[in-house]
């Protein structure tokens, strides 16, 4: 019926008699709610909040990937500044539950209440996504690692052991969220249960054979959410267009939620595109996927909702330094996000908007320390062209109210005079405004294609432009051409320049349009009769033509900003792309809808965070990285402007703005990293090392509930003994002689391991980007065996995290251990890992922060540790880089302290840079520690990441900083590593990071550490 109606609407629209059919389209889709509130409603077209339709343009960030609560404001202000109406976040069960007796939502960055409070202060709705499973390229997909042993079943089902495990966490996060719902005046609008759990059906979803176990699990999650106060709509995110799970339109089977959604990563969620072919098919750059028919078939009575749409891609081990932004950069943002609009999507959340890092052991094996994700906000918190390109569309969707209710009237090349260009016509059945999303017929092609567009307007069918040069799609680009677009009390008959935003000052609208640099635009304002040029910066060939009961304007815009005024009170600002990147529309209200009278327009700065109007004073906050002008369009009553609290000397321009200038920030220089000290960190390799202390446990279990049984006994799975992260040390004892040992270790992609016998190095598995398990037959031929005392074989292995989804239970540890040439075998094994195991010795940094290296267990990485008896390291200097070297296969820990004194009223981002000197071996692994936090894993033999941003709060910008590097040499060549740091960017900023008191995030060394030697 829907498709037939759409075809009828296309025909009627072309004939100009569509109103009756449009009325039918409206009445076909009644508003729905969940029966618990009518604040959040929805229908076929969009979500509706407090009676208003909204285009939800959201972006994801993970607070646990930036564990400095003060910086959450920075990320959220940048998301808001880009025109977004919402943001989303995963809550991490793992981050809050170090063991099965603890749920911590109060310590440090584990207190998530500031996120909800910031949302209300800044004016953005929240999509809350608590799991309990989240995927997210997180260790075990966000499961706490104590559930990966098999003791809690196979997970993600209705097994009571698993239910009892997740219930305390899920109850707590649900109760917290329940206090911040939009139904009670706060800003959380939906609550997602589980994640990409497309398991409602056994086999082919079209056969609708229920998976009763999965349904029972979803019912448990739903009941918990409702029992603990959630009245918001419950949502899910299908992992792809094949699963059709949990939507009421598809089936009335159990487990259904209020609103289903679809996740999509059309250019692959990883830089390793081979991982996505089973979902997306063969990879073709910039090839789009069709969503409209999926939503029409799977959930026609619901909005086209995408809880995750590709905001970038994660960088796997072996991927390029800095990620793979080539086909997921600003062109991707321009094309694919507009494509979604052409598919009638009215709610989408970009995954990720800010990725951040994977400090400690937060990552799954698929990725390294960086979680930059090529997101619009980089992991160092800078914004780049992709951010600005995304902003151009998000600001448009925030202002285009009619876009929230449209039908797809038709699509194809018949709309254009160039067969290389196609258009999708969306039309609002109530207002008759239309949106023509234009694309290359083959979106993988990047040719420069000129075209005219046939549009149906209130003045009849027109072919535009009529006077200006043709519309162009130059490169991997898309454009949305509007007709009968309402701005304030005025109407735009059509515009071939894209709408950026608009605002109404003193009852007169200011419309902002933009074109790519050097291109032409044409627009027609209904009711206008005369136009004039008030500012021409880069404009040419300006024409005003009276027609269609209004005034048509055509012009070409090179670099700069042009301002036109019309006799009906309309002001039009036309920008080229570069100028549009530096154009902002900060809200004067915390209403996410941002009413048309509640914003100002600003051109010039690197970032505008906020604006507040008080009487005749406009207070603007933001960032400046270079000297720039500040051009402010505001109500006439504004007489003075401040920037970050300082008065700006402004003057009135002839085009109605207040204009001033902003100075560049003062430069800074980081002190050199020098005066290194070092000490061996592998005493455990020697046979006479005493492993009877608190750090060690007997590895003596003869059974396991893990579905993967070991080849040999005892069970040498580290998680079974409460040690879950990174480096673990196994000491296997045996008496008498043996010719060698066969050892098989599993640690995840890019893991490695090394072996020593009685202090003598035997061999290493160096690792690679794909191998998760590796065995070696170790020869004892050249080693010294003891005949009168026990021999000790030390196995040091790291792991790169636990696998995601069904792989979360894959063991980490020794799968098989056999002596060769010996009948007696190993007498016993001892195991050490993170100091205190699951006891959460350092609740601020958390159990995922540390591995089992001696240096970490005893706290050499912590501020305040006394290294006065250490010898100073004679580190070589390569330019400003310190080169730290040693010989032999061992682990060595390097340590220094360095002060910072960052000036006030600035935002500074700092990265460490690790390197391997030319000609030196890459057969080593290293970990970077900053004030006790492990903030980088450097595996030069495998990966390419060399730059490690470390945020303020982890770094002390007004004090001493403790820097540590643990280097594990996997060959007798030893290792040489270079280390330096650099400023990523410096901004004059309202953030004023140097003034923050963050010392509570950096607890120091305590005597308790001594017992873990």
Curated annotation (Swiss-Prot):
Annotated catalysed reactions: Hydrolysis of terminal non-reducing beta-D-galactose residues in beta-D-galactosides
Cellular-component GO terms for this entry: extracellular region
Predominant subcellular localization, coarse grouping: secreted
Signal peptide: 1-21
BP term (GO), one: polysaccharide catabolic process
InterPro entries per UniProt: Betagal_dom2 (IPR018954), Betagal_dom2_sf (IPR037110), BetaGal_dom3 (IPR025972), BetaGal_dom3_sf (IPR036833), BetaGal_jelly_roll_dom (IPR025300), Galactose-bd-like_sf (IPR008979), Gly_Hdrlase_35_cat (IPR031330), Glycoside_Hdrlase_35 (IPR001944)
Record: residues binding substrate: 90, 135-137, 195, 265, 373
Name this polypeptide is given: Probable beta-galactosidase B
């Amino acid at each position: 019926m829907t498709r037939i109606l759409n075809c009828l609407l296309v025909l009627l629209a072309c004939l100009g008699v569509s109103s009756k059919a449009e009325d039918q389209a409206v009445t076909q889709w009644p508003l729905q709610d969940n029966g618990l509130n009518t604040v959040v409603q929805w229908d076929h077209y969009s979500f509706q909040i407090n009676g208003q339709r909204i285009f939800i343009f959201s972006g994801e960030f993970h607070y646990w990937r930036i564990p400095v609560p003060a910086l959450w404001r920075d990320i959220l202000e940048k998301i808001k500044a880009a025109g977004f109406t919402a943001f989303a976040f995963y809550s991490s069960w793992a981050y809050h539950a170090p063991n099965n007796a603890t749920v911590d939502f109060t310590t440090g960055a584990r207190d998530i209440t500031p996120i909800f409070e910031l949302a209300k202060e800044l004016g953005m709705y929240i999509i809350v996504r608590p799991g309990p499973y989240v995927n997210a390229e997180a260790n075990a997909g966000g499961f706490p690692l104590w559930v990966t042993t098999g003791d809690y079943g196979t997970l993600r089902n209705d097994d009571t052991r698993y239910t009892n495990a997740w219930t305390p966490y899920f109850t707590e996060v649900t109760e917290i969220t329940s206090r911040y719902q939009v139904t009670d005046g706060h800003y959380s609008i939906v609550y997602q249960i589980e994640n990409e759990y497309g398991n409602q059906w056994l086999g082919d979803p079209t056969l609708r054979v229920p998976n009763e176990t999965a349904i029972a699990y979803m019912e448990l999650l739903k009941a918990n959410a409702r029992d603990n106060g959630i009245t918001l709509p419950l949502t899910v995110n299908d992992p792809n267009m094949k699963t059709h799970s949990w939507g009421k339109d598809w089936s009335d089977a159990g487990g259904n939620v209020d609103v289903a959604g679809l996740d999509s990563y059309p250019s692959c969620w990883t830089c390793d595109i081979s991982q996505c072919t089973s979902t997306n098919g063969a990879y073709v750059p910039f090839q789009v996927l069709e969503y409209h028919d999926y939503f029409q078939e799977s959930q026609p009575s619901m909005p086209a909702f995408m809880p995750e749409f590709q905001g970038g891609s994660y960088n796997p081990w072996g991927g390029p330094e800095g990620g793979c932004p080539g086909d997921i950069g600003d062109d991707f943002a321009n094309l694919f996000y507009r494509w979604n609009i052409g598919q009638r999507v009215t709610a989408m959340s970009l995954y990720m908007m800010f990725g951040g890092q994977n400090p400690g052991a937060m990552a799954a094996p698929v990725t390294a320390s960086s979680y930059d994700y090529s997101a619009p906000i980089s992991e160092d918190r800078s914004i780049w062209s992709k951010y600005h390109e995304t902003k151009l569309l998000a600001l448009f969707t925030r202002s285009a109210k009619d876009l929230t209710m449209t039908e797809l009237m038709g699509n194809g090349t018949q709309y254009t005079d160039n067969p290389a260009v196609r258009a999708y016509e969306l039309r609002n059945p109530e207002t008759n405004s239309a949106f023509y999303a234009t694309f290359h017929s083959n979106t993988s092609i990047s040719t420069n294609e000129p075209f005219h567009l046939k549009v149906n307007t209130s003045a009849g069918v027109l072919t535009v432009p009529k006077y200006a040069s043709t519309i162009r799609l130059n490169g991997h680009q898309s454009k949305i051409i509007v007709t009968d677009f309402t701005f304030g009390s005025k109407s735009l008959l059509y515009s071939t320049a894209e709408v950026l935003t608009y605002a109404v000052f003193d009852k007169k609208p200011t419309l902002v349009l933009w074109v790519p640099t050097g291109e032409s635009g044409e627009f027609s304002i209904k009711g206008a009769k005369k136009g004039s040029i008030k500012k021409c910066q880069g404009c040419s060939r300006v024409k005003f033509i009276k027609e269609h009961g209004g005034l048509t304007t055509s012009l070409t815009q090179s670099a700069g900003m042009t301002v036109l005024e019309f006799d009906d009170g309309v002001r039009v600002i036309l920008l080229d792309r570069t100028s549009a990147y530096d154009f902002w529309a900060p809200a004067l209200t915390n209403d996410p809808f941002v009413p048309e009278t509640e914003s100002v327009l600003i051109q010039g700065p690197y970032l505008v965070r906020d604006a507040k109007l008080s009487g005749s004073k406009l207070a603007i906050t933001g960032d400046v990285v270079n000297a720039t002008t500040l051009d402010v369009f505001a109500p006439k009553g504004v007489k003075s402007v401040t920037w970050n609290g300082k008065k700006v000397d402004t003057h009135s321009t002839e085009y109605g703005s207040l204009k001033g200038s902003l100075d560049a920030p003062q430069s800074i220089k980081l002190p050199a990293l020098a005066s290194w000290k070092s000490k061996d960190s592998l005493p455990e390799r020697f046979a006479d090392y005493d492993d009877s202390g608190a750090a060690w446990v007997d590895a003596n279990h003869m059974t396991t509930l893990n579905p993967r049984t070991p080849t040999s006994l005892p069970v040498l799975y580290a998680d079974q003994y409460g040690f879950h992260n990174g480096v673990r040390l196994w000491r296997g004892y045996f008496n008498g002689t043996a010719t060698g040992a066969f050892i098989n270790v599993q640690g995840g992609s890019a893991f490695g391991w090394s072996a020593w016998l009685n202090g003598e190095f035997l061999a290493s598995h160096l690792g690679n980007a794909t191998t998760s398990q590796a065995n070696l037959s170790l020869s004892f031929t050249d080693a010294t065996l003891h005949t009168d005392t026990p021999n000790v074989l030390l196995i040091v292995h790291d792991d790169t995290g636990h696998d995601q989804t069904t792989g979360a239970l894959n063991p980490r540890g020794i799968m098989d251990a056999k002596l060769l040439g010996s009948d007696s075998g190993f007498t016993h094994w001892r195991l050490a890992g993170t100091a205190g195991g699951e006891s959460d010795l350092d609740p601020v940094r958390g159990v995922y922060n540390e591995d089992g290296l001696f240096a970490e267990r005893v706290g050499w990485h912590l501020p305040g540790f006394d290294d006065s008896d250490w010898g100073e390291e004679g580190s070589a200097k390569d330019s400003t880089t310190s080169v730290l070297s040693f010989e032999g296969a061992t682990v060595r820990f390097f340590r220094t302290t360095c002060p910072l004194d960052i000036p006030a009223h600035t935002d500074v981002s700092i990265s460490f840079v690790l390197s391997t000197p030319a000609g030196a071996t890459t057969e080593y692994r290293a970990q970077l520690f900053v004030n006790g936090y492990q903030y980088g894993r450097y595996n030069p033999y495998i990966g390419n990441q060399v730059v490690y941003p470390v945020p303020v709060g982890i770094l002390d910008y007004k004090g001493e900083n403790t820097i540590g590097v643990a280097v594990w040499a996997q060959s007798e060549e030893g290792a040489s590593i270079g280390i330096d740091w650099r400023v990523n960017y410096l901004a004059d900023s309202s953030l004023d990071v140097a003034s923050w008191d963050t010392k509570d995030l950096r607890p120091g060394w305590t005597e308790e550490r001594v017992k873990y030697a």
